[in-house]
């Protein structure tokens, strides 16, 4: 007799509406207090949805004073701090991209924020926090936040 084994990854998922940048800042600041070495945050959303804005607020919440801007053309920006921030924009990549060695940062002891994460999904750890940002108006955004493993409790804490 043969047996087939499979695993199911369970995730905690919530949906939130942020009315403006102040709400976005409050959410990112709350999240910044729960970061740990090896934290992986995946961001998805249309152009202009607020992925980089969220990352700026997250960095400020971490105490980073450098200007945080989009790494669209550089792929990766590193902000050194007590807990380093590795900010990636992988929109232009298909797969991990051998020239960039991004896995070195994804699995490092800092905080890794990845915009357009679906382009390198197969290179990501099973446990991660995913935030999908949808535009609902000039300033309003609908966020779907999903976490697996260690990130499930963080999702619960963000459910305000």
Where are these regions (language model features)?
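N-terminal pre-Walker A segment at the start of P-loop NTPase domains
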Residues: 11-28
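Short phosphate-coordinating micro-motif centered on Lys-Gly-acidic
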Residues: 14, 60, 105-160
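Hydrophobic anchor at the beta1->P-loop junction of P-loop NTPases
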Residues: 41-43
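Walker A (P-loop) phosphate-binding loop of P-loop NTPases
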Residues: 48
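Conserved lysine of the Walker
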Residues: 51
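Short beta-strand-centered segment that lines the nucleotide-binding/catalytic pocket of NTP-utilizing
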Residues: 64-79
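Conserved nucleotide-sensing/catalytic segment adjacent to the nucleotide-binding pocket
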Residues: 78-118
